[in-house]
């Protein structure tokens, strides 16, 4: 069995959720948001719109199919929304250490560690989602070893400029011009 480290999610209203790490172990902060998207976790984690946010998927079990190979078609990734994880962290209910899929190359935990993104499991995400639904998105922080970081509000920064491409990128040279 792996050596699992405890950590906690602290919301700006003082609510504390205890969990266990399965990703990178670093105290971070951001806006805590839940998502109900019908996409996989690789797509959600690499979605640039989640920059600065701590994601809470409403689906209870995450990690069961691992992380796919980084495959491209016509210069566009087949399984990711961008070239890296953009969210600050991910909070889930149940983490599957055993993953299985014909296209997986590594575990979600391994990928999070490589990308230096914390992940916590064992948190009641239903209760957390209900709280966020009733009170709106809240600032939060993940604390390891009682090391606290200031709350960070990504809405105060120009996140679009941070995640946008710096130059024009053309995909394909087809007959039609799509704008």
What are these regions (language model features)?
Residues 1-179:
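RNA-binding accessory domains that recognize and position tRNA/RNA substrates
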